Amino acid sequence: MLNIVMHTPKSFCILPWISLESTAAGWIKPCCMYNINMTDDNNQPFNLNNNTLDDAWQSEYYRNLRQDFLDGKMPEGCTRCWSEEASGKVSKRIRDNARFKHHITNDMLENPKIKSLDLKLGNICNL
């Protein structure tokens, strides 16, 4: 197994191990910058109307996303961060890796736990 403390791939992002977010429409994503829909085993987008947070967290999609980062890949849904970094800006990925660096451990790789949950529930009155 990769020793994440000793060797963090250059493209690594901690968020898939510690974070979930939802949009006001209920779409579940690893972060607000992720620009494609996460999908379930039936290729249906994860949505709070049909799925639990645990469904997304434990999904093959999320496991594959985590593995892509460990393999040094640059996942397609993260193009906003890659674009910011290519233009010399400090991306959300870089800021959050620094912010949450104390969570980057080998145990985190084996037992990912939600540490940051951002639920955007919208502002439509339901009375």
Regions inferred by a protein language model and the residue ranges of each:
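A Trp-anchored, charged/polar loop motif used as the substrate-binding/catalytic surface
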Residues: 100-108
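Accessory C-terminal segments flanking Radical SAM cores
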Residues: 2-99, 118
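N-terminal pre-triad scaffold of radical SAM enzymes
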Residues: 17-26, 107-127
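Histidine (H) residue identity feature
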Residues: 7, 102-103, 123
